[in-house]
Amino acid sequence: KCKHVRVAFLTGPLFFAATGQFSESFADLGDTHALILSMRGVPLIDTAGIEAIHKLHTRLQKNGGTLMFAGIHDSAKQMMERGGLVKIIGEENFFWSSDQAIVEAERRGCSFCPQ
């Protein structure tokens, strides 16, 4: 419903060879309030992937946005936990499904939209 909530469906491992394409995909966030990364298709993340996600989170946060995750595999989330990313982003931004994340993003409200 809110045009400022975006969902991206990722597939394949997020490791050093894929981080360039990952970063390029989110080069223009425009007026994105909440970016939901559906991670069901991402079996693993390495330290380069964690760093790319952290940079994306920082960019969104600077503009008042939120990075959210849906359907993340346990192994990928464990890597994010080891890298400190779950603590930085917040456990409240991890969801079982994209639908749940979208509902929550819209419930939280959008600073760009009239309330």
What are these regions (language model features)?
Residues 1-115:
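Structured cytosolic domains appended to multi-pass membrane proteins
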